[in-house]
Amino acid sequence: MKVLVVGNGGREHALAWKLLQSPQIEQVACVPGNGGTATLARCQNVSLAVDDFEGISQYALNQGFSLVVVGPEVPLAKGITDYLQEKGLMVFGPSRAGAQIEASKAWAKALMQEAGIPTAKAAVFTEAAAAKSYIQAQGAPIVVKADGLAAGKGVTVATTIEQAQSAIDAIFQGQFGSAGEFVVIEECLTGQEVSVLALTDGLTIRPLLPAQDHKRIGEGDTGENTGGMGAYAPAPIATPELMALVQTEVLERAIATLQSKGIDYRGVLYAGLMITPNGDFKVLEFNCRFGDPETQVILPLLATPLEELILACVQQRLGELPPIAWQGGASATVVAASGGYPGDYEKGQVITGIPQAEATGATVFHAGTKLNAQQQIVTDGGRVLNVTGIGENFQQALAQAYTGIKAIDFSGIYYRRDIGYRVNS
């Protein structure tokens, strides 16, 4: 079988890497891929944009790729699944209607309220004045969110009313483009965030291992939000008892409510949870795709062949499969970023030490990398590499990841030294 993976990040490298472990997979193509997928055996990069739906469909059909796995949220929100399915391709990823669960925070909040899913109290506004008067009445701390897709940068946890009002101005003045047509204002929840990614065929939904991400750029969870600076799985705070509640109160309710709206949702449903100090949980957000960097710690522990699960979702027979199997132990990944990220950064810096990192036993997933004219691997984004370790416990997994990342160098390299601080004691 030949599989086409859409995207160019660490998540997509991990998906291609995992798919290629199966003898059932003859070839993987990545659109557009990165420097890591370019060097995988039986994998090739295809120089097309992720929103060039016609080009992707023509390539897949002409080259005999029957299954398309979509990584990022933007093409899903633009309707890539609908387009490719009309051309006769099997697609793993929700339709444009289903992708609203990530593409519109206001739509997702309404769905949660309708479904009875535990979530933060919230209000939605279309003009700045009303939003600001609501904030005056509610007080700070408070959370301000741009409604649409903003690459993880559209959320402000405001500690003062002034900061919240500035965030509202930025959204309505167009900082996030069409993502800022609405603003969602939520109560500020405290506790630990957990990512629960689940696979669904539209009827059955099965969670993967819970993971914890580190979103802030700085050690001690300080500084600006990023796409994620590291992660580990399975997250101990997501106990079996809590996961059983998440299954019934979040995942199954979400799928049932999507069904009631006529939405046949097949792909990943990713619930971002806040676990409060008293052990309760609320859903902060839903995403319509694999998490990044969570995928890079979940897939190394997956024992069931990935393509079996993906095909079962696409063909709506997930309920017929045995429970998802996992190898024991723990997994951790540390993100190497370009200096200056999440602000401005340079591209084109030559990367050294990747073979040495892999020789330590770590797995290096490429994110913002490419091959230059001299066939050297160079930086090509803010988050550059994800160095993943696995072990019998978190101490071993984190030690392997950090031993690996210390072998890697490029001008301006930055990574957090405290990934896994909650579990590495």
UniProtKB/Swiss-Prot annotation:
Pathway: Purine metabolism; IMP biosynthesis via de novo pathway; N(1)-(5-phospho-D-ribosyl)glycinamide from 5-phospho-alpha-D-ribose 1-diphosphate: step 2/2
Enzymatic class: ligase
InterPro entries, alphabetized: ATP-grasp, ATP_grasp_subdomain_1, PreATP-grasp_dom_sf, PRibGlycinamid_synth_ATP-grasp, PRibGlycinamide_synth, PRibGlycinamide_synth_C-dom, PRibGlycinamide_synth_C_sf, PRibGlycinamide_synth_CS
Gene3D superfamilies: 3.40.50.20, ATP-grasp fold, A domain, ATP-grasp fold, B domain, Phosphoribosylglycinamide synthetase, C-terminal domain
Any one GO molecular function term: phosphoribosylamine-glycine ligase activity
EC number from the UniProt entry: 6.3.4.13
ATP-grasp domain mapped to chain residues: 109-315
Positions contributing to ATP binding: 135-195
Transmembrane parts of this sequence: none
Keywords: ATP-binding, Ligase, Magnesium, Manganese, Metal-binding, Nucleotide-binding, Purine biosynthesis
Gene Ontology biological-process entries: 'de novo' IMP biosynthetic process; purine nucleobase biosynthetic process
Presence of keyword GTP-binding: no
Cofactor(s) the protein requires to work: Mg(2+); Mn(2+)
Tree of life domain: Bacteria
Cofactor note: Binds 1 Mg(2+) or Mn(2+) ion per subunit.
Reactions catalysed according to its record: 5-phospho-beta-D-ribosylamine + glycine + ATP = N(1)-(5-phospho-beta-D-ribosyl)glycinamide + ADP + phosphate + H(+)
Protein family per UniProt: Belongs to the GARS family.
PANTHER family: PHOSPHORIBOSYLAMINE--GLYCINE LIGASE (PTHR43472), PHOSPHORIBOSYLAMINE--GLYCINE LIGASE, CHLOROPLASTIC (PTHR43472:SF1)
HAMAP family membership: GARS (MF_00138)
Protein name in UniProt: Phosphoribosylamine--glycine ligase
